Amino acid sequence: MRYMTSEEIREAFLKFFEKKGHKILPSASLIPDDPQLLFTVAGMVPFKPIFWGKVEPVYTRVATCQKCLRTVDIENVGKTPRHHTFFEMLGNFSFGDYFKEEAIEWAWEFLTQVLGVPEEKLWVSVYEEDEEAFRIWNEKIGLPEKKILRMGKEDNFWGPAGPTGPCGPDTEIFYDTGYSKGCPEGEECTPANSEGRFVEIWNLVFTEYYQDEEGKLHPLPRKNIDTGAGLERFCAMMQGVYSNFDTDLFQPIINRIEELTGVGYKTDEEKDVSIRVIADHMRAITFLISEGVFPSNEGRGYVLRRIIRRAMRHGILLGMSEPFLYRIVDAVAEKMGKVYPEIVRGESMVKEVLSAEESRFLKTLEQGMKVFDEIVEKKGRIDSEDAFKLYDTYGLPLELTLEIAREKGVEVDVKEFNKYMEEQQRKSRVALGDVEFARRYEYLEELPKDFRTEFTGYEKLEDEGEVVLIAKNEKAVEDATEDAVEVVFSKTPFYAEKGGQVSDTGTVEWEDGKALVEYVFEASEGVIVHRIKVLAGTLRRGQKVVLRVDKKRREATMRNHTATHLLHAALKKVLGDHVRQAGSLVAPDRLRFDFTHFKGLSMAEIEQVENLVNEWIMEAIPVEVRYTSYEEAVKSGVVALFTEKYGDVVRVVEVPGVSKELCGGTHVSNTGQIGLFKIISEESVSSGVRRIEAVTGFSTLELLRNQKKLIDQLKEILGAREDELTDRVLGLREKVKELEKKLSQGRISEEKIAMKQLEDGARVFYAVFEDVEAKHLGGIADNVLKKEREGIVILLSKFEDKVSLVVKVSENLLDKYDASSIARNIAKELGGSGGGRRNFAQAGGRHPEKIRGVLERLEEFLR
């Protein structure tokens, strides 16, 4: 076999299958278009809808090199030659086209003829009941029977993913590395009986069955092929090395780690593990952040944070005490950037996010490790409450706590960890959402089967309809008089709250009555329910009515919805492609947009975004709406949210040259109708997620009027011109600070400060205050010594559930007493720390309830 680089292997695979009639598709995102998955874990994930029969394939033959991420075995990464978080999966797929024979023959052809792998180095396994696969390997390929292992369902049968679904046998191809590890004495080594010698390099899955609820298999009308081969394993094979970490995919990264840490690779096994962990994790970190995932305490962000913190801890084991991971990003980008240009485009952003996260974690890690050691010293073990405290207070992910415990040989019991986690999250979760849905709307069973409300609100703000169902107190009724009820009409122009856009409001009128529409929602797919209040007359089932949407409210909402799309586009342009929508609210009076970004926007960035949006508004660009297939929409570059469900036909809202999104909301027909766009706030929602609130149209005008009124009031109160207001306010602020200081010192100086005389004649002046900030205590201590001339001053203040402390020692006592030592002694008792100089020191603590004990034993702390 000739040596081949990773680039050559990747290119050879794709070219080979292109010649076999496959469409070569680029790698999909690591963030799948699938709400059931956090990450793309295999090459087949982007094609799940096709395998599941939900979508018709555009191409029947496809080949890809897919970037993937898995953390299920993260504790093994670095300890074995082939476990990884981020990896690349080569794969060829057939959707109802070729099947077993071609899949096996082409895999063999690629391995033996393109890569030049000696046939004697290859073994295979097949499902024990799959005679067809056995026959192809034996008769078509010519592989001897002894090199075809028949294995059970656990080893050679894939799926289904749940209790039911597509599934089928598979065949695995193994490469014999030649290493005689774990082979039984007197027996020939095979993939079934050796440990580590044979490496699985390719898995060919034959999806030919559907498993029903009873576990029975039924032949599928359309059979599919799904194959996966790890590029990292191919590289190890073609580069003549046993470990994936010795390939050209990892060596440049490992070299960079050696430079930064000063630790040589392959000099010490424990340190080698740490180097491998960092090398692996840096690939995952770089790709995740470049795709807009940021460290946080939930979902993808939590997984990223775990990976970063695990890499950091191994850096600490190599002697690193400052942020350093961000300095490895360029090595990853240099190696992988030609194939995945997104990591080059996002390189500076990745470094910035990573550096900030490293700094944040280092501040808490040292304290967390001290607490870990204290718990172990006291209890000899870690329990669920301890593990949660380490996570919640000190930022140690549970997995990291478990790993540290294993290394130290400490027993861990975390059975109740999730209970503590759930309790913490309880208040922030809308935990009753699913229960509410299941409990309510039973009255919908009264509707005709397959009933759908006809929505006419894209074209009309007024329409005629018929009352199909009336419900009160969760039960269907025949009529309603002066009541608040929920009503289903045959058709409606009212938009139901969905996709972040609030519902329409308006009126319903009939021959002798009228009602207000207060809220509209979709209770089940296609069934729109109107929550109304009958003002006059009696509304009856079967009644013909006229439904009128509040025109001004709808138009204001439309302005804000289109502006939200423009804002999304502007944020991507100003901040980068990593920006993704993380939530929104579109109301008539304002819009709110949550998005992924790693830090607050500067004033300059906010102005850039505002200017861009207003430029697009001024250009009066026609807004286009069209319906197309989901596949065509995605191919055209449309922005879709992975959390949303889309049908076969989707609605695309496009502002040509600016924005293109899948959206079911209502929009203006021309950007000029928005009028004016103004950002009113920008803030953090959670780690890695920012929020912008903005107004448009008449709301902007109202905002400007209110601001003008405020400025006029300030001018009158301060007796200043508009251009003098800033200086005048700053001057007032300084005066207030000075007055507060004087007031605080004056008030405290009047308090009775106790005095105690020591055996050596030295006097100790001490006092405890309420709600006095630490910054004022030093001045009070100065005043005491000015008045008393000599002595030791110890002042404590309970402020915001914490304790602040200052100690001051007069010059004549410095040979006997050290303020820094006294402060540290007291702070330790109060659960804190501190220090300073011999004549003056400051400290803090977390246990104000222990102050009384400190005062009772004051002399002890002076020693």
UniProtKB/Swiss-Prot annotation:
Binding-site list for Zn(2+): H561, H565, C663, H667
Role noted for this protein: Catalyzes the attachment of alanine to tRNA(Ala) in a two-step reaction: alanine is first activated by ATP to form Ala-AMP and then transferred to the acceptor end of tRNA(Ala). Also edits incorrectly charged Ser-tRNA(Ala) and Gly-tRNA(Ala) via its editing domain.
GO biological process annotation, one example: alanyl-tRNA aminoacylation
One GO CC term on file: cytosol
Pfam families given in the database record: DHHA1, tRNA-synt_2c, tRNA_SAD
EC class of the enzyme, as a word: ligase
Cofactor(s) required for function per UniProt: Zn(2+)
UniProt GO MF annotations: alanine-tRNA ligase activity; aminoacyl-tRNA deacylase activity; ATP binding; tRNA binding; zinc ion binding
Record's cofactor remark: Binds 1 zinc ion per subunit.
Subcellular location: Cytoplasm
EC number(s) recorded for this UniProt protein: 6.1.1.7
Record's keyword terms, sorted: Aminoacyl-tRNA synthetase, ATP-binding, Cytoplasm, Ligase, Metal-binding, Nucleotide-binding, Protein biosynthesis, RNA-binding, tRNA-binding, Zinc
Catalytic activity: tRNA(Ala) + L-alanine + ATP = L-alanyl-tRNA(Ala) + AMP + diphosphate
Gene3D superfamilies assigned: 2.40.30.130, 3.10.310.40, 3.30.54.20, Bira Bifunctional Protein, Domain 2, Threonyl-trna Synthetase, Chain A, domain 2
Protein name in UniProt: Alanine--tRNA ligase
Provenance organism: Thermotoga petrophila (strain ATCC BAA-488 / DSM 13995 / JCM 10881 / RKU-1)
Domain characteristics, as noted in the entry: Consists of three domains; the N-terminal catalytic domain, the editing domain and the C-terminal C-Ala domain. The editing domain removes incorrectly charged amino acids, while the C-Ala domain, along with tRNA(Ala), serves as a bridge to cooperatively bring together the editing and aminoacylation centers thus stimulating deacylation of misacylated tRNAs.
Family: Belongs to the class-II aminoacyl-tRNA synthetase family.
